[in-house]
Amino acid sequence: MRTWLSITLVVFTIVARADGPADNIVEKVRSVPPPGAKIPDDVRNELRDGADKLRKEIDSLRDNLKGKSNALALLPDIEIYHKAVDWALRFDEILNPTNEIPAARVLLKQGMERVQQLRDGKPVWNSATGLVVRGYVSRLDGSVQPYGLVVPATFQSNNPREWRLDVWFHGRDEKLTELNFLTQRQKDPGQFTPRNTIVLHTYGRYCNGQKLAGEVDLFEALADVRKNYAIDDNRILVRGFSLGGAACWQIAAHYPGHWAAAAPGAGFSETADFLKVFQNEKVQPTWFEQKLWHQYDATDYALNFFNLPTVAYSGEIDGQKQAADMMAKAMAAEQLELTHIIGPQTRHAYHPASKLEINRRIDSIAAQGRDPLPKRVRFTTWTLRYNTCSWLRIDRLGKHWERAKVTAEIDENTLRIESENATALSVVMAPGLCPFDAANRIRVVIDGKELAGPRVPSDKSWDVNFHKLGGRWYVGEPHEEGTVKRNGLQGPIDDAFMSSFLVVRPTGTTAHEKIGAWVNTELAHFTNEWRRHFRGEARVKDDTAVTDADIASNNLILWGDPASNRLLSKIGPKLPIAWAAQQVKVGRKDFTASQNVPALIYPNPLNPDRYVVLNSGFTIREYDYLNNARQVPKLPDWAIIDVSTPPNSRWPGKIADAGFFGERWELTDRR
């Protein structure tokens, strides 16, 4: 359904850079973020001294607060100020000295004020209204990450009421350092500030459309907000415009049971057509890249909008109207109709009358809230990374990167399920929510086969597993030996960087000098790019210093070869790709070890609940930074990299071979 509104236009600008054909040249890639500007030495020294002083005060405060967990939990709210200025100086990220030098002084002053407040036991920001910036420590890399809040004037910290929360995803801004983000979030409340609503502005680890580590940032920031504010779980909404609209599409599509509503504006919703239309790029993906588009193409998850009220917006003459048009087409194929508000004769901005109409609809949906137990769920996925919608969970797939589809419906005391490409399912209804009659057994019909479900316990919960064996469904968990692909342990390589990870560098010498040089270059490239693009410093240890506790709590990112990295040598015989001094063997294929390096992800033989990765960081590279629609995993579960071809802005070398492991993490020839 398209709704057209006409009124005199007031333009709301969105910070963005116009991408185009100039950004389609692999050999000529500009820097993102851009290079910093030169600042006077006396100003640099002044800010450096201020940041160092703030760091010392934070460290002293941490010592003084030992044993006071509630107060210690507030330290990230101070550390965000230090990081913002410290990083701007250390990494030459003062981009506009006229604005950012005064802003840095303000942030240092605010950081010192919070130090004093916390030392006095009066952290006033914890109960403040208006524009508030806060932070949390990420489990991924131990870094401090910021977020902004708009706290309504009606908020009272001692009031037990639960608040509606709207999450706002920001647009593309290549200059959005922590310094600029904190400054913006203390000046600009944003496009939408509904009454009696807390608005969360995520940083998203810079400029990635809430993908990969940026996706994790949403949930970590949300968890931190919940610690400090009483949030109504059934009235959390997601919104965004431009790159934020793209983020909204993908977060809504992958997590449809989490939110009360979604309101994406502009942006993009898939990779191939957007790059063709908006970027004028001739896209020629490898077969595995094309499969990996299924991770973030929201169009592939269009069915999931059956479960989530959604109001899309586009300007009539905005090139990014393409995003909602593509979603409308994909939803129509699922017999769904997209509500699409269109601002007449409007480019890349919100039309004021359209904003009113969006608010009318979204506020009405929010007043109803999310249904915690819908009678019917229709859910699709391509990977177990995204496996849950409301009370339905897909636990195993027949084959990753092919579509799985499940429809589940409650019909009085019968549960009916129809499935495709799913081999294990769970139904999880929280205490008090199960609608079935506790006095009778529940009838379950899966793909036409009738099963007897367990009775409802006295707390009115219901948690039941189903598995498929030999083409038939049974009640209970699957009986499995060895490792299998499951949620959080399904690949591809980039998945290792969506939970806590530890980089393990080699202390020995590689068997081949060329391999050693490549390892050193790519390890440095990864740690530098993680800092620049995911705004954290990767934790790094020598292979000789890794402890049992490290192995228990982290994905291990091993660099080197069996000769140079003792951990790689230890686990190597248990990996499906054999790596000897002269040869790398992948099934029946052999590669010369003097010029080929395996990169892979696999359940860690030393801790099968965590990953081990060989010789790879996250797989998007500098070319992909230039348009966010390119920021999709580039390598599958394993790859053989021919290092005789030097790394460039797209690849770590020539990809001699690559593929996905099967559902039992076995080598397979299937594509």
Spans of features found by a protein language model:
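Mobile cap/lid helix-loop segments that gate and shape the active-site cleft of serine hydrolases
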Residues: 171-184, 257-303, 307-308
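C-terminal catalytic histidine-bearing segment of alpha/beta-hydrolase fold enzymes
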Residues: 313, 317-415, 420-421
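Amphipathic, heptad-repeat alpha-helical segments
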Residues: 20-78
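Gly/Ser-rich "nucleophile elbow"/oxyanion-hole loop immediately N-terminal to the catalytic nucleophile
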Residues: 154-161, 211-243, 253-259, 304
